[in-house]
Amino acid sequence: MPDTTARILALRAAGTSLVVELAEPVPRVLHWGADLGDLPESALAALALTGEPAVLNNSIDIPRRFTVWPTEADGWSGTPAHQGHLAGASTAPRLSLAGTSYQAQDEGGELSLRLTEPGAGLDVTVTYRLEPSGVLAVQSRITRHEDADPAPYDLAQVATLLPLPRRAQEILDFTGKWSRERSPQRRPLGFGTYARQVRRGKPGLDSPYLVTVGVPGFGFAAGEVWGVHIAWSGDQQYLVEQLPEGAGAHAAVLGGGELLRVGEIRLAPGESYTTPVCHFAWSGQGLDGLAERFHTLLRDRPNHPRSPRPVILNSWEAVYFDHDLDRLLRLADKAAEVGVERFVLDDGWFRGRRSDNAGLGDWTVDPVVWPEGLTPLVDHVRSLGMEFGLWVEPEMVNLDSDLAREHPDWVLGSSRGAGPSSRNQYVLDLANPQAWDYLLEALNAVVDKYGIGYLKWDHNRELHEAVHGPGDRPVAHAQVLALYRLIDALKERHPGLEIESCASGGGRVDLGILARTDRVWASDCIDPVERQSIQRWTTQLLPPELMGAHVGSATSHTTDRVTSDTFRLITALFGHAGIEQDLTRCTPEELARLTAWTALHRELRPLLHGGRTVRADLGGDATLLHGVVSQDRTSAVYCWARVATSPEGQYGRVPLPGLAAEATYQVRVRTELGLPSLHQTSGPGWLAPALDGWLTLPGAVLTIAGLPMPNLNPEQALLLEVRRTEGASGA
């Protein structure tokens, strides 16, 4: 990309913009947020002039500027862009601009800034790439000069930071646990630092996921919001920071990066460290607007799944470790009968794996359980017209395995002995080249022998004491990079191989792993009450086609809650759909309902996996309305769900978000999956005609005024379909 002589540079796309001034010694961010338009040089100069803050009492004697790489040299007292030292020295970096490359496009572009720090012998390159979706991808690279002091530079922290305005005063992020991932939490932004640190070796079940700051009371449909997601599958940190003196002309900062373990990154001359990509996005239309940006970003990727997402049956909740060929053949027969398109054999197929106490690491088919190998099952599944997939957990190892007995040094952990196990397992040291080579060849052999087209890739134990080698050197960073290389190498050998990211359910859901996998398992919990919330918030970052959403048996295997098949089936429609139950024990009525469900999913799949996700602001958690609207707003499907009781009798009119107010639509209730139980004597006036067929209504009535919704009993759902009538305008 060419260098530029301009002093103020802008990137613009999809209603958002970034403006940077090439100030000396370090450039500063003048604006990130709503698009300022195609500003002439005079207007850009005015933006720079008005971006100069006041000099405060009892403060430094020059205006504080918030730079692209904030340090104490700028008078910045907040979290610095980086911290490190040379044997306890060179701890106060002073950077200066050494080069710029800039390429603006009609929608987006890229700005790269090279900074130099002679004291520690560092070059820092910060690259801003504004995608056509309006998502701003920021990545930095720190390199030691070839002729630098031979002592290693210990890099302790790198944080990517962008400014926030004063009106951004409320924080939304996430927490969770096993079977309850991505639980939202809100708090006001006060003075100081709000930091979320993850030290699990993966984002974790309590992952911050997507940290959003917005105007007070922002919701799904309204309110200005700014968000960041760190595309990294290991330790990470997010922060929102507001100092009394502000951040230059701005009020606060938002950002984060990889959380580096002490002594993990030591740069010798010529060596580099590259940060994960931090994805920033702004929306003036609330959380749905923010989600749309990320969904567009992901769908625009060259490696985004293009073929229809096949309906899956996963064997885990059907048979667990009881791998019996005849039983699995019968299960496959039933799966094909109800319309399943991909059959996945879960945990229990490999050597010594009769429980979770043993076998992990020995990735060959158990000859006792499978005397003829997997071939009889694989061939039968394919003869029924289904694809065949397999569960693996390559990064984990049981001490009761041939692999651990033969190579105890391949187990990641302290030289003073293994720490506590998790589900009876430990982590394999992927930074060990021999262990990495073994895994690649073992996985390749299984995939190659059986023509496996799909792997469910699990990961359970956290990376506690992620050290190896003499002196117990930290390798959490190297472990993630080795994982990425392993998946990339396996996919290179097997073009078309699809991989699902699973980590005790939804413990590794990030755009780093999704750069090389094809979907995520949102949670081990498929109880529809829990899944309504889990899926609602997983789609804040991911489009539905990347999120596994399965229907299970009436009694949930994780909560023991009993729910209706109608509620379970409607909930599982809104993702990459699948089944987790023993179909050989289903009644004919249950099988008929599942058959109708798979047919309905195939009918709605182009809409569900290509439309815009919308969610209604209802002011409480007892009832939920969410849906998917086609990009041209000609069709939509909505779920109206009640997950708990509430004092409300009438809900008032509930707008169906995303439709064109000026158009005319038809509405009907889809009844193939059954009808919900109602907590009322009779339904609202529109419900009966919508149950009988298509009811024609103006778009303004549907999306502005709204429909009075039926009062459902708890743990019930209603499915609405909407289509625009011929000849109606309103694109």
Show the residue positions of the predicted features.
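Polysaccharide-binding surfaces and accessory modules of carbohydrate-active proteins
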Residues: 7-10, 18, 27-244, 664-682
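Carbohydrate-binding surface patches
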Residues: 15, 210, 222, 618-661
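Conserved, mostly hydrophobic/aromatic
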Residues: 15, 140, 270, 313, ...
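Glycine-rich, aromatic-flanked loop segments that form ligand/cofactor-binding clefts
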Residues: 63-96, 220-236, 280-303, 340-347, ...
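Short Pro-Gly-centered flexible turn/kink motifs
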Residues: 95, 265-284, 715-722
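Aromatic-lined carbohydrate-binding/catalytic grooves of carbohydrate-active enzymes
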Residues: 306-441, 454
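Glycan-recognition surfaces
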Residues: 383, 398-437, 480-584
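C-terminal beta-sandwich/jelly-roll accessory domains of carbohydrate-active enzymes
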Residues: 645-731
